[in-house]
Structure formats: structure tokens, C-alpha cells
């Protein structure tokens, strides 16, 4: 029975968020293949992870058996979140671009889950090799050749922290662009391109969810 770790981070609710709708397409396809499977779901906007504090940060560099009671209590959440990543067979993350970077709630989650010598910074990180799908929606266009190409920080950062130099996950990005075109004056000429990008994102999410679920079921 495969386990999916699903994180949503959009500040917008279902129906108003492109990243949430696309992760939902992935999950629907996944669950169709694994109706009895397990999904670990965290809505980091509705139930945010607190920012990492000093005691918990230091505890990450100390063997658990040597923790003080204060360090053990502070590290408990980090251990829980890292364990959720380790238990998952696949990871799904909705990561919309906010002010040219990832949502702060996702950064807080990463700060807790990056445990050096365990999930990261180890010869073989504890979740290495697992497939991760990131829905990196954005209101504008930041692809190669666009005027704001140099403002693209989301994909390079997540590739580093989730990929070979971090958790060691096998990361694939789905990038719905121009999500603000239908509501932003001056972007009217981009509406059809935005719709096409959204359609492609849903199709990619459904295909990816189905394929990964089928592979893990084999």
C-alpha cells in the first residue's frame, strides 16, 4: 500500500487557487489507483508549521539519545515531520510563487525537515530516490527568454533543497503560468496562453499521478 505525502501552501482556498486545483488533479489520479492507500496531508496555510527556533535547530545536530528534556521537546515536531517524509512513497507539493519565492509556510516546513545527517547532508539521505512532484504556479511568466526570467528563484531553490543536494528526491516540476492573466488589467492578451498553461498543468498532474501510482503498485 503506497503512501503519498501531500502539502498545499496557497493562501487561497480551494476553487480560487491554481496550485491547489492542480495538486487535486494529481491526488485524484493517484487515489483512483490506490483507493485503499494512505495520504498524509498537510495544509500549511490552514495549519502552519511554526518557524524553527534555536533549541530545535541545535537539537538537530545532537544525537537524540543525548538530548536534554528541553531539546527533546523542541525536536519532537521536527522528528514527526521528517518521519512523514520518510514514510512517504511519493511527495506532492503545491508551491505557488509569492514575491518571487516560495511561501513562507513551505520554508518553515523545510527548515524543520532538513535534519543534517538524516534527511539531508548524509551519504544517502533517508528519503533519497523517492519521486516528488512540485506544482509551482505563478501569476506571471518567468520562463527562459521572458523579460522576467532573472526573477525565477522558486525552481532553482526547490531543485537544490529537494533534489540531489538536499533530500535526494527525484523532482519533477509542473508549472502553470500567468495565473493572474484573467484578473489583472494589461494581461488580457495573455488569457488564452494562461488557459492553455493551466490545462497542460492539469493533464501533466493527472498523468504523473496515475503513472507513479501504477509504478508503485507494480
Role assignments for model-derived ranges:
Residues 148-152, 156-218:
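Glycine-rich phosphate/pyrophosphate-binding loop and the adjoining helix
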Residues 10-13, 139-142, 179:
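A short, flexible beta-alpha/helix-coil linker loop
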Residues 43-50, 140, 178-181:
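Short, internal active-site loops enriched in acidic
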Residues 121-168:
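Short, glycine-/small-residue-rich phosphate/pyrophosphate-handling segment
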Residues 106-125, 135:
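Conserved nucleotide-sugar donor-interacting segment of glycosyltransferase catalytic cores
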Residues 3, 38, 130-131, 170:
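Residues at the starts of beta-strands that form the adenosine-phosphate
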Residues 1-91, 95, 100-115, 202-218:
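N-terminal beta1-alpha1-beta2 submodule of the flavodoxin-like/Rossmannoid cofactor-binding fold
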Residues 6, 93, 132-136, 173:
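Structural beta-sheet core signal
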Amino acid at each position: 500500500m503506497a503512501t503519498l505525502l501531500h502539502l498545499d501552501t496557497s493562501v487561497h482556498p480551494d476553487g480560487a487557487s491554481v496550485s491547489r486545483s492542480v495538486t487535486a488533479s494529481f491526488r485524484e489520479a493517484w487515489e483512483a489507483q490506490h483507493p485503499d492507500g494512505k495520504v498524509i496531508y498537510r495544509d500549511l496555510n490552514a495549519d502552519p508549521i511554526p518557524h524553527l527556533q534555536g533549541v530545535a535547530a541545535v537539537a538537530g545536530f545532537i544525537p537524540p539519545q543525548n538530548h536534554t528534556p528541553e531539546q527533546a521537546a523542541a525536536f519532537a515536531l521536527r522528528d514527526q515531520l521528517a518521519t512523514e517524509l520518510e514514510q512517504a512513497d511519493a511527495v506532492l507539493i503545491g508551491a505557488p510563487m509569492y514575491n518571487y519565492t516560495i511561501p513562507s509556510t513551505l520554508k518553515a516546513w523545510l527548515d524543520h525537515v532538513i535534519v543534517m545527517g538524516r534527511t539531508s547532508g548524509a551519504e544517502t539521505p533517508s528519503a533519497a530516490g523517492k519521486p516528488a512532484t512540485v506544482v509551482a504556479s505563478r501569476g506571471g511568466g518567468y520562463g527562459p527568454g521572458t523579460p522576467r526570467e532573472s526573477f525565477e528563484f522558486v525552481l532553482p531553490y526547490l531543485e537544490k533543497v529537494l533534489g540531489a543536494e538536499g533530500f535526494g528526491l527525484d523532482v519533477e516540476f509542473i508549472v502553470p503560468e500567468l495565473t493572474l492573466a484573467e484578473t489583472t488589467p494589461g494581461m488580457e492578451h495573455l488569457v488564452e496562453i494562461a488557459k492553455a498553461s493551466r490545462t497542460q498543468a492539469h493533464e501533466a498532474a493527472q498523468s504523473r499521478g496515475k503513472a507513479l501510482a501504477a509504478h508503485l503498485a507494480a
